[in-house]
Amino acid sequence: MNQSAQLFSRARSVIPGGVNSPVRAFRNVDGDPFFVQSAKGAYITDADGRQLIDYIGTWGPAILGHAPQPVLDAVHAAVDRGLGYGIPAPAEVDMAEMITDMVPSVEKVRMVNSGTEATMSAIRLARGYTGRRKIIKFIGCYHGHVDSLLVAAGSGALTFGEPDSAGVPREMTQLTLTVPYNDREAVKKAFELHGSDIAAVILEPFPANAGLYFPQNDFLHFLREITLRHDTLLIFDEVMTGFRVAPGGVQQLYGITPDLTCMGKVIGGGLPVGAFGGRSEIMDCLSPLGPVYQAGTLSGNPVAMAAGLAQLRELLKGNAYERLEQLGARMEEGIREALKKHGRNYTFHRAGSMFCLFFTEEEVYNLESAQKASKKLFKSFFWNMLEQGVYFAPSPYETGFISTAHTEEDIDRTVEAVRISLSRLG
């Protein structure tokens, strides 16, 4: 039994399922996970010494690669000053100023400890600010494990939410309306029926937790227009896309100003961090200024702030975003050529350094279309890639991430692994 197998056996006796987050269990690929010993740059080394090119990047935060030296230096310096204070510290102010500079829609920001905390707090704030109860979310958009947002769709275009997890009472989701992403008519119907009681519309502007797909027919501008017309807040969950697809996220690319933005991942530099921010008049409803309570013992942790600041500063130096685009384009070109060579018209989506390969020849634009992709083909592809030393996400519904630490050689080696893996699919 190898080291990873031994560790997984031990883990299952003390950790539910042997993992601390479900996707890590490899259930979607019918296997057991490997355990990581270390990570540096674009590579991870597992407990048995195997080195892999990594395209998970801790699920998004590692935009500079693993353990970048500027971030390590900042963390070491911060640790020497103390691990946490529970008292305001300069780094919190520096981080808030950095975020408000990079994301113009954010006039004020509150730090939290995860993306889940950010979306949970933003929803509470939206309800407190508007005095309304209902929320619209989109099927396939993931906003953390918040009770009211763990909702699956029922039949029809518009449903009152049914819980998507045991332990979530139906009453917790009854105020959440779910509609298909990219479906204007469903959104219009929701506002026709409930417009006066809709506090907010929340979405991932690029849904990236059901594969990766994009708005069609000016969908994001449509949402901004209809929410303004109904005095409803528009919340962009840019935990995935923020500071990655562009310094200011998807909202910068599309020229849209949401009322609130949820952030995380990249702004932590690899440590646990989340944030939510928006217009001052909305944010000032938060305690201690306003009636909406939100708090956190470790919010604004000085070590996490130091890591995040160092990462953001590095991103703004030189040509990091241009570099990420070049690497992403190189991968896309290579994978598309490989698909063409093997006569497979599978759908490949990319936004800068984010990417996803769907094993379907149909267009993917929402969760329903994403679910038409072959899980059987994906599973075979995943294990073939891993055998060749390339680690893609162990789920057909996850996004891959490129970092500035990847090289052209890494990309070319990955494309060659894709070619070989496709040839083995039969």
UniProtKB/Swiss-Prot annotation:
It catalyses: (S)-4-amino-5-oxopentanoate = 5-aminolevulinate. One of its GO terms (molecular function) is pyridoxal phosphate binding. Pfam families: Aminotran_3. The keyword Isomerase applies. GO terms for biological process: protoporphyrinogen IX biosynthetic process. Disulfide bonds: none annotated. Keywords: Cytoplasm, Isomerase, Porphyrin biosynthesis, Pyridoxal phosphate. The modification N6-(pyridoxal phosphate)lysine is found at residue 265. Pathway: Porphyrin-containing compound metabolism; protoporphyrin-IX biosynthesis; 5-aminolevulinate from L-glutamyl-tRNA(Glu): step 2/2. It comes from the Bacteria. Its cofactor is pyridoxal 5'-phosphate. It is an enzyme of class 5 (isomerase). It is found in: Cytoplasm. GO terms for cellular component: cytoplasm. SUPFAM superfamilies: PLP-dependent transferases (SSF53383). Its EC number is 5.4.3.8. Belongs to the class-III pyridoxal-phosphate-dependent aminotransferase family. HemL subfamily. Homodimer. This is Glutamate-1-semialdehyde 2,1-aminomutase. It comes from Akkermansia muciniphila (strain ATCC BAA-835 / DSM 22959 / JCM 33894 / BCRC 81048 / CCUG 64013 / CIP 107961 / Muc). The lineage of its organism: Bacteria, Pseudomonadati, Verrucomicrobiota, Verrucomicrobiia, Verrucomicrobiales.
